[in-house]
Structure formats: structure tokens, C-alpha cells
Amino acid sequence: MVTDQGGRTSEADGGPVRHIPVLLEEVLAALEPAPGKVILDGTFGAGGYASAILDAGAEVIALDRDPTAIAAGQSMVSASGGRLSLIHSRFSGLAEHAPAEGLDGVVLDVGVSSMQIDEAERGFSFQKKGPLDMRMSAAGVSAADVVNRAKVSDLIRIFGFLGEEKQAGRIARTIEKRRAEAPFETTRDLANLIETVTPRKAKDKIHPATRVFQALRIFVNDELGELAAALFAAERALKPGGRLVVVSFHSLEDRIVKTFFQDRSGKAGGSRHLPLVTARAATFAPVGKPMVSASDEEASRNPRARSAKLRAGIRTAAPSPGADLSIFNLPELASLARLGG
């Protein structure tokens, strides 16, 4: 919830590395930062969006749940002339950090950052041997805790729903047999086992472990629950005319964002299950296209941009109707949240 999922470019003179996040131009076009505006960046990461927003003259309140990102960003704070505040916080709590008069914009870049993936000791990548951790902060259960202790039925739900893994049952049952002999400790332990269960075929575009690792990361960090809570928080924190811009990389993330904007713009209709939908004033109006994806040029330059989707809305003056997870029609969210708790 990939905080900044872009690549990195080095300055020609050998100066500092500048992080270029995904869909930067598109994010700025939707967000419209300018002098006098206060923008909240809910996923600071390596500071790519925050830096560009500062360059446009706006003030930035930046959040990140990863203490490593907070520490690394202190030099940006010092160089900002007081226009950047960097706060260790989950973005679900963004309304707590908004000024009383409201925010002019909120940007969220959802998921795991390239910085986190690149650090083997964080345990996010199956391509690097490291501890099976995947936590964005030191709190909570690790991926190893889940793999070694969860019921097989729960592993199947996690891999199947969050990872959309078709072989969830086979993988979970094989994990159960293996952990009875020795616990899983490293990323390679788990990746190697998955490869034996679902060996890679020549036509496969992704590694066999991709979906399971993605599912564990999303579960360990409650990424979908955090995203849903952040959308409702942004609705409360934005002033009329303020803009909410969200970049997501996973189909379930995009489904949540799309559903939120449809519901809040009054475009969500009934269904055979919920045929009667009470009309209410729209709290968001659309910005540009319903969904923006990376250009072919950006996708070829940065493979991580291929799955990126941007959605945005402008806050109206209508009062927030409050948080309601039922609008997403994802009962699995509450079920998995109870499991994580």
C-alpha cells in the first residue's frame, strides 16, 4: 500500500538519489498542490510524492507506519523550511493529524514500498533470503507466526482471498506437514516449499510464491482494513474542494477504492441482495477519468507500475455519513480482521 512503488534515479553529478514514485505526473495533476495548500501524504515511504508536492509550493503533513522511513526522512524535514511535518502513524488515523480547518488534499500510495522490498532483513521478498517477517512496523504478528501457527483452514482463507491463489489448499496442507518437522524461519524456506507444490511453468509470468507472499503481507499489516479506514478518515478530514488521490496495486485494493468513490458519489446502485439504497448527498465528485493507469513508457521503465491504478475525487460540502464497511460487500474483511486480532 506500497508506499512509493517507483524506481530510483541517480543525479548525473553523483549527487543524492532521488526517488521517482509511480504515476507521479498523474498524481500531481489530480491533487493540484500549490502554495497555501496543505496536503497530507499518508504513505511517505522514500518521500517521492512529498518531495514533488513541496516543489509545487504546498505544505505537507506526511505519515508512515514504518519507523525506518521516518528516520530516513528527517533530512527532508530539515531541508523543507518548516513546510514538511513527518509523523510516525498509520494512515487510517490521518484525520487525527489534519488541521482544524481541514486538508486541501490527501494522497495514498497503498501497499509495500520498494525500499522495504529491497531490504532482505525485512522479509518482504521471496527473491532475497531474510527472516520471514513482513511487518511494516515492529508491532503485531510476523509472517512466520502466521505460517507456523495458523490453522490450515485459516491459511487457505488468507492465501485464497488475499492472494487469489488457486492452489491455496495444497500449499496450506503442505505447510502443515513441513512445520511439524521444523518451523519456517526464512523467506527462502517458504518460497522453496511453494515451488515444490506449484512448480513454475515456462508460460508463467510470475513466481509461484508471489501470491502467497502478497497474501501474508496484506494480512500481517491489515492492509485492506487500513485502506478502508483511511478512505473514511480522508472523507472527514478534507475541506470542501479538497482532493483525495489513491494509487493501488492489488485488485482487492482497487475494488475497495472504486466502491468507495462510487458509493460516495451517489453512483452505487442496488443489487438483488440490497435492492433499496437510500439516496443521500454525494460527498465526492469525480476527477478526470474514473481510473488512470501507467503509460506504456512508464510501465516499460518500471515494471512495478504495470499494475498501478489511480482513482481520485473532489470533496463536496455534504456531511460525511460515517464509516460503513458494508458498502464494500467484502464480509471476508471483518472475518480476517477477527483472525488477525
UniProtKB/Swiss-Prot annotation:
Reaction catalysis annotation: cytidine(1402) in 16S rRNA + S-adenosyl-L-methionine = N(4)-methylcytidine(1402) in 16S rRNA + S-adenosyl-L-homocysteine + H(+)
Main location: cytoplasm
SUPFAM superfamilies attached to this UniProt entry: Putative methyltransferase TM0872, insert domain, S-adenosyl-L-methionine-dependent methyltransferases
Pfam families for this protein: Methyltransf_5 (PF01795)
Keyword set includes NAD: no
Subcellular location as annotated: Cytoplasm
GO molecular function, one term: rRNA (cytosine-N4-)-methyltransferase activity
Keywords, alphabetical: Cytoplasm, Methyltransferase, rRNA processing, S-adenosyl-L-methionine, Transferase
GO-annotated cellular components: cytoplasm
EC number annotated for this UniProt entry: 2.1.1.199
Keyword Methyltransferase: yes
Annotated residues for binding of S-adenosyl-L-methionine: 47-49, 64, 91, 109, 116
GO biological process: rRNA base methylation
NCBIfam families: 16S rRNA (cytosine(1402)-N(4))-methyltransferase RsmH
PANTHER family cross-referenced by the UniProt entry: 12S RRNA N4-METHYLCYTIDINE METHYLTRANSFERASE (PTHR11265:SF0), S-ADENOSYL-METHYLTRANSFERASE MRAW (PTHR11265)
Similarity comment text for this entry: Belongs to the methyltransferase superfamily. RsmH family.
Biological function: Specifically methylates the N4 position of cytidine in position 1402 (C1402) of 16S rRNA.
Protein name: Ribosomal RNA small subunit methyltransferase H
Native source organism of the sequence: Sinorhizobium medicae (strain WSM419) (Ensifer medicae)
